[in-house]
Amino acid sequence: MQEKIAVLAYSGGLDTSCCLKLLEDKYNYKVVSVAVDVGQPEDDLKEPEEKAKKLGVLKHYTIDAKEEFAVDYIFRAIKANALYEGYPLSTALARPLIAIKIAELAKEIGADAISHGCTGKGNDQFRFESVIRTKAPEIEIIAPVRDLNLTRTEEIQYAKEKGIPIPVDLEKPFSIDENLWGRSIEGGILENPMIETPKECFAWTVDPKIAKDEEEYVEIEFKAGVPVAINGQKFDAINVIKEANKLAGRNGVGRVDIIEDRVLGLKSRENYECPGAILLITAHKALEQLVLSREELVFKEMVDSKYADLIYKGLWHEPLRHDLDAFVDKTQERMNGIVRAKLYKGSLRIVGRESECALYQENMVSFENKDMDQREIVGMVKFHGLQAAIFESLRNK
């Protein structure tokens, strides 16, 4: 009888390490593990590979997807000002790409199943499985932690029985996910929304209280809606994001602590570090205010909100997402310019912006010239609010 093979999305954490052994013990699969590089630390790629091999996988793959993540995902998110309840979607944005790469590998090696370590309460099960079913509908999906209804304590006990190194303990079980666009921190004492996030949770952002005492000015240049240079220095896609992370992070900008509405309907307390994302999206929105018309801005705000909602829910391949991209891309054709931001001890302010495509005309708004004859406005003003005036007259009869 031919061995059945499962491709496991493997991070090296407790959930996926338990999945690796459970696939062998409970499901009778041989395991091929894979990590997709979307900008996580080098150790977060090296250690899982070593750990997977020690735990007996047939083979481990590391797939470099950083460039694709930056260009095809992050840049799209910037153009759409993608924020879900104030969160720049760092984890949510990476999941479709990771799922695509895993599905492609599974098809390439003829795997019988694809497995992940998602729980039944989180968002990632929706994000992974919607993409996998789109890209590889013929391949079975197995989620051992969810399907066996395991608690964190039960996982730790199972790991001890199987000799799996435990990366967390019961006193400090923070779950951290990191990629090029940001870090997410959840679990443990953070589940109590009244407890302030401990300082040790943060890695990318300096505590605003001890950030440097001088204001730092940053100029970001955009071409067709995407950042191409910072402070006059040109960067490729990956490094422009890294530079933004560095500059905002060292000034304490980019910490997000929210109560978030999950796909399932649960509310969860989430902490994020996303300095570059906050800086770039804030600057991009400032440029749009300069360039787009009022009607475009009002409509695009609705588009941006829906775009973020689709990403958060894992609906990357939803036809509407492609439709929204078409609108967003059209608005970004003239989104060229420079935005100046001031960073200081956790605060971010836009203090300047310029564009050759600006609809802002200084000569027309200035109080010091007569390019626009004020007397010609009288007729327009007379009928402004006409319906409200009629309504009031009827109400007062």
Curated annotation (Swiss-Prot):
Record keywords: Amino-acid biosynthesis, Arginine biosynthesis, ATP-binding, Cytoplasm, Ligase, Nucleotide-binding
Range of residues in the leader sequence: none
Primary enzyme class: ligase
Pathway(s) this gene product operates in, as recorded in its UniProt entry: Amino-acid biosynthesis; L-arginine biosynthesis; L-arginine from L-ornithine and carbamoyl phosphate: step 2/3
Catalytic reactions of this protein: L-citrulline + L-aspartate + ATP = 2-(N(omega)-L-arginino)succinate + AMP + diphosphate + H(+)
Pfam families found in the cross-reference section: Arginosuc_syn_C (PF20979), Arginosuc_synth (PF00764)
Any GO CC annotation of this UniProt entry: cytoplasm
Subunit text: Homotetramer.
Stated name of the protein: Argininosuccinate synthase
Gene that encodes the chain: argG
